[in-house]
Amino acid sequence: SANNTSNQQTTSSEKTKQTIASKSLESKPQATTEASKNDKNSIPVSYTIKNFEIIGQLPELPTGCEITALTMVLNYYGLNPDKLELATEYLPKTEYSTYYKDGKLIGPDSDNYFLGDPKSVYGYICGTGAIITAANSFISDKNAKYIAKDLSGCDFSELYKYVSQDKPIIVW
């Protein structure tokens, strides 16, 4: 699509396949701020990514904040998913049930699966692995040149730097 084409242009020094990260989405370089022109490691005190559309999760996804956030970021890159499509078709889900074994509480893998259903008030949570899987599956189906990656544990200054470079991140 026309939206996709402009987002996939890269300089010769960039990799063919770009990186999209749950907690950071990367694409072509954007205009720099005054601070970053002078020092690539400088982070502005305040920065707003322009043309970033906010999408509400309610009423359709009462417990689907993570997948709604991913929808907003993918929209920013021109991939235009529907939040319900991402929640239904791409987000890995499992039942939320626990039991005790040898005195330990055992439950499902909340990092790689959404526990329950994000369309239900009884849905619970998912971790980065589930969002990365949903993002990469959707991106692959669209034949887009992005990859989701996990930046968990990185320094906050690195996250701020992504934002100051017009690269939205997802944090929860």
Locations of regions flagged by a protein language model:
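Catalytic cysteine-centered active-site loop
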Residues: D141-G153
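Short helix-loop-beta junction
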Residues: A134-K142
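Active-site-adjacent substructure of cysteine-protease-like catalytic cores
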Residues: L151-W172
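Active-site-adjacent structural segments surrounding the nucleophilic cysteine of cysteine proteases
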Residues: S1-T128
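Short secondary-structure junctions and interdomain/linker hinges
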Residues: S97, K142, I169-I170
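Generic surface-pattern signal
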Residues: L91-E95, S140, S164
